[in-house]
Amino acid sequence: MREYAVFTSESVSEGHPDKMADQISDAILDAILKEDPYARVACETLVKTGAVVLAGEITTTANVDFEAIVRQTVNGIGYHHSDLGFDGSTCAIINMIGKQSPEIAQGVDRQKPEDQGAGDQGLMFGYASRETDVLMPAPISYAHRLMERQAELRRSGALPWLRPDAKSQVTFAYENGMPVRLDAVVLSTQHDPEISQAQLKEAVIEEIVKPVIPSEMFHAGTKFHINPTGMFVIGGPVGDCGLTGRKIIVDTYGGMARHGGGAFSGKDPSKVDRSAAYAGRYVAKNIVAAGLADKCEIQVSYAIGVAEPTSISINTFNTAKVDEELIIALVREHFDLRPYGITRMLDLLQPMYKQTAAYGHFGREGSDTAFTWEKTDKVEVLKDAAGL
């Protein structure tokens, strides 16, 4: 398959309305898992001017204050005053959460935990590449870092006129499957009305873009599109309705890898949309880190109520150092991809999900985002088994 000559990915900030919804859903999931690790949670959130709507299905023994969690999350993101168009302390909260269908539960629950069935049918993908030090595609990796930098400068007060809502988009030129130069950066950030566009553009380029992207990637033709529509004062849920699960490409690989269509946030690990996608990343990252391939995409699929995957497929894009059939055999031998096996392998019953809900679920290795699916603890066993 011909490689892309250029590739673009986007990210959004924690104050983007869709990401607000994701964070609320995952904050509720975390609060429930703290009290009831085996709860069944499917929590959806909608945010719009002055209101948060919760819906979905939750079956749990936990006693959770949904309203308090919503308000704490919204205020923590930075929407804590009516001047910003949304105030977590005064917004209306509508709760429409019910319980999980017993017909779904009977397909998942088993007397022996290892026989736990998948919570639904579906297909999931995992991916890793040698493009960056975290084995992620460069465009999405740097798009996320731009958004994290925007939030850092906003929270620290270094650029006090920044507001929570923002988006980034990064285009890299490629040669031989590797990024070689930065062709374009798009960054739109919400701001106070007093700041001039000239000041904003200079600050964004000098304080956000240049500290994040390696200097050797810039060239004379690099294009900067900073707040290209001009004023961006009205943002967050006032500007756009936000929904859980509407940023699935931002959450994963920025379009560089395939996506099975299932969102992550608000779902407990029995939902393979989430847990199997995490397992896919874990498998692909260990394959690449072990040197079995320079690039790897794995697909797994499931049937509702059935523990074993219905299929496991690998694509190394002609970069494999060993036969792909051997790689699949090693995956089956060394990674338990049954739902219970994934949960145990990656310790997924911990209340850690709110941290995943902004700036990407993959490629993050910070002290508070050292997610288990980013470990490369299978490298030596894979190398030995492959004879490398």
Swiss-Prot record:
Its EC number is 2.5.1.6. Residues 100-110 are annotated as: Flexible loop. It catalyses: L-methionine + ATP + H2O = S-adenosyl-L-methionine + phosphate + diphosphate. K(+) binds at residue 44. L-methionine binds at residues 57, 100, 240, 271. GO terms for biological process: one-carbon metabolic process; S-adenosylmethionine biosynthetic process. Disulfide bonds: none annotated. One of its GO terms (molecular function) is methionine adenosyltransferase activity. Pathway: Amino-acid biosynthesis; S-adenosyl-L-methionine biosynthesis; S-adenosyl-L-methionine from L-methionine: step 1/1. Keywords: ATP-binding, Cytoplasm, Magnesium, Metal-binding, Nucleotide-binding, One-carbon metabolism, Potassium, Transferase. GO terms for cellular component: cytoplasm. Pfam families: S-AdoMet_synt_C, S-AdoMet_synt_M, S-AdoMet_synt_N. It is found in: Cytoplasm. ATP binds at residues 16, 165-167, 240, 246-247, 263, 267. InterPro entries: ADOMET_SYNTHASE_CS, S-AdoMet_synt_C, S-AdoMet_synt_central, S-AdoMet_synt_N, S-AdoMet_synthetase, S-AdoMet_synthetase_sfam. Its cofactor is Mg(2+); K(+). It comes from the Bacteria. Mg(2+) binds at residue 18. Binds 2 divalent ions per subunit. Belongs to the AdoMet synthase family. HAMAP family: S_AdoMet_synth1 (MF_00086). Catalyzes the formation of S-adenosylmethionine (AdoMet) from methionine and ATP. The overall synthetic reaction is composed of two sequential steps, AdoMet formation and the subsequent tripolyphosphate hydrolysis which occurs prior to release of AdoMet from the enzyme. Homotetramer; dimer of dimers. This is S-adenosylmethionine synthase.
